[in-house]
A protein has these predicted regions:
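Low-complexity, intrinsically disordered terminal/linker segments enriched in charged
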Residues: 140-162
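A solvent-exposed, acidic/Ser-Thr-rich amphipathic alpha-helical stretch
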Residues: 47-98, 104
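Hydrophobic pocket/interface hotspot
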Residues: 39, 50-52, 59, 73, ...
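Exposed beta-sheet edge and beta->alpha loop/turn motif
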Residues: 109-138, 142-145
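Sec-dependent N-terminal signal peptides
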Residues: 4-13
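Conserved N-terminal glycine/acidic-rich loop preference
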Residues: 39, 51, 99-117, 127
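Short, low-complexity N-terminal intrinsically disordered segments enriched in polar/charged residues
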Residues: 16-49, 53, 161-162
Length: 162
């Protein structure tokens, strides 16, 4: 019994002596998070051109596995307002991670919803975006969303323009 008590006390001391490996910290009320909220609102309003003020000129931007330069990603996001109405970011969460290695990334999670202007179909998909910062500029972005509806509706829109 004495050995069991000593073993339990030893385990308790070892368990309490674990040091935390803090990798950084996360804020949701900082300037970078506010900038991303402003950029998201400009997208929802149908004009993402404001992003040029914050993007580095040589940045790369991924929409799932498709890579775009600054002009390509801005034009692409602006085109959404040609095909959809009532675009929304439901349950939006924006927070910025400041990591010990010096990297800073803003995370933007939401449920994207919209109604097709042409077909009237309603869509709703979860979406996750990462905005990678170099000082006060955004050098890269990555957005993951099911692109099926966007591609289908874009094809219908392109066909209607011919």
């Amino acid at each position: 019994m004495k050995k069991i008590i000593i073993l339990l006390i030893t385990i308790a001391f070892i368990g309490c002596d674990q040091t935390s490996q803090n990798a950084g910290f996360v804020l949701n009320d900082d300037e970078k998070s506010e900038i991303i909220t402003t950029l998201a609102d400009s997208y929802l309003a149908g004009n993402f051109d404001l992003a040029r003020d914050y993007f580095t000129p040589d940045g790369t931007h991924l929409f799932n596995d498709l890579e775009f330069d600054v002009d390509g990603i801005i034009d692409g996001y602006n085109s959404h307002s040609l095909i959809f109405k009532d675009i929304r970011h439901n349950n939006r969460e924006v927070y910025t991670g400041y990591f010990n290695d010096g990297t800073v990334e803003t995370f933007h999670d939401f449920n994207w919803s919209a109604t097709s202007i042409i077909t009237g179909k309603e869509y709703n998909y979860p979406c996750h975006c990462r905005w990678i910062w170099e000082e006060d500029k955004i050098s890269n972005t990555v957005c993951y969303v099911d692109p099926t509806s966007i591609f289908e509706e874009a094809a219908i829109y392109a066909e209607s323009q011919n």
